[in-house]
Amino acid sequence: MTNLFRNISFIIILTLMSSTQVLGKVYPIEEWAKRADISEVSMSPDGEKVAMLRIMEIEGNPILEVYDANNLGKRPFRMDADPMEIVQFYWVTDDKIVFSARQKVRDKIDGFNRGVYEYSGGILTLDRNPKKSSWKKLTSVGRGGIVSTLPKYPDNIIISGYPRNSRGNIESYSRVYHNYNIKTGTKKIITRESSNRRNIRFDEDANPRSARGYDGAINSSLAYYRAKDSSEWKIIKEQNRADFETWRRIGY
């Protein structure tokens, strides 16, 4: 009985000591505000390259790094969009990456529906000789960003944007979706959001196939589906705000 009591006491003391050590460690406030060092990791279509966004220092902007997938120890290609900040990217082909970027241009909202950031985009063309790799600005990629690539049509991507007036202010938060040719800079409207349907997603041929909505009368989010050769949207799922079930679409 004495041995049992001694063992229990020893375990309690060890637990208290370890708890004191953990509670005694102080983290500076900056640590809690840090963004993820590495994000957006993805592989090129041919599996030969790995790209990611990496933050090298606490207050630094993300840098796009491209590695040789067969030799990750090899020095990667690095690129930033200074003075802009890369926020997302997509592989278009084995040697082309499109990305969207933002830049803080004002300290407070200036006018109706005008934020502190301005948005743009670019396309990076990789070369076997990293010094010959280059990128150019895609002015049509704005706040709505890049929605999807189109692997069957490598010169095209789907982008979205918000209608603006002559002063540059956003008039509506219902996005317009365009099929954008990255070679010629031309774009064609595919569809527009409505008050009922937003976050439209597309298939490999740029056909609108799914969307999201919300019905306040029944306090539920709605999932919409549209067949490939149809213009009719159908509700395939209603989910009340009190329902925490998770689900996702696998394909079309």
Which ranges hold each PLM region?
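Bacterial N-terminal signal peptides that target proteins for export
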Residues: 1-9
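Bacterial N-terminal signal peptides
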Residues: 9-18
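Beta-propeller folds
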Residues: 24-252
